[in-house]
């Protein structure tokens, strides 16, 4: 997939495609045929500082760690973005989410992994 601006982190998406974060830029969503579906910045009107880790949960929502803003946002397929973590992160980098509603964030600023519960309903 050409024409990315500093690709950093990547995650498979529920549609068979993938999501990729761009350094100091945006987060792009691609189809299974590797065509650009959307950019989260444009779709949601969201301004990223330095998007880092990305993951897609069982509901198809995209989670993005912002290294510069020290936050994690959830971007649902429908509806407005939700800030899941706004405190307690120094330099969020890689991320993963479980089917049990747990979010794992590698905090490079504190050399640790932090675990958050973000979904109330069980799988």
Map each language-model feature to its residues.
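A short beta-strand motif characteristic of beta-propeller blades
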Residues: 1-2, 35-45, 80-85
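Intrinsically disordered, low-complexity segments enriched in Gly and acidic/Ser/Thr residues
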Residues: 47, 57, 63-80
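WD40 beta-propeller blade core
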Residues: 28-29, 38, 63, 72-73, ...
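Conserved beta-strand positions in repeat-built beta-propeller and related beta-rich domains
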Residues: 20-24, 62-67, 105-109
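Blade-level signature of beta-propeller repeat domains, shared across WD40, Kelch, NHL, RCC1
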Residues: 91-123
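Short loop/turn segments that connect beta-strands within beta-propeller blades
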Residues: 31-35, 75-78, 119-121
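Beta-rich, blade/repeat-based domains predominating
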Residues: 1-17, 24, 45-61, 88-100
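Glycine-centered loop/turn positions within well-structured domains
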Residues: 25, 70, 80, 102, ...
């Amino acid at each position: 997939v050409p024409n990315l601006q500093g690709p950093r982190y990547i995650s498979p998406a529920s549609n068979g495609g993938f999501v990729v974060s761009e350094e100091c830029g945006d987060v792009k969503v691609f189809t299974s045929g590797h065509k650009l579906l959307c950019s989260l910045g444009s779709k949601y009107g969201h301004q990223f500082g330095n998007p880092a880790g990305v993951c897609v949960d069982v509901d198809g929502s995209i989670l993005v760690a912002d290294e510069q803003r020290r936050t994690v946002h959830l971007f649902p397929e429908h509806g407005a973005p939700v800030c899941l973590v706004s405190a307690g992160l120094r330099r969020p980098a890689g991320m993963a989410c479980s089917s049990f509603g747990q979010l794992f964030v590698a905090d490079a600023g504190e050399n640790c992994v932090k675990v958050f519960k973000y979904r109330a309903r069980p799988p």
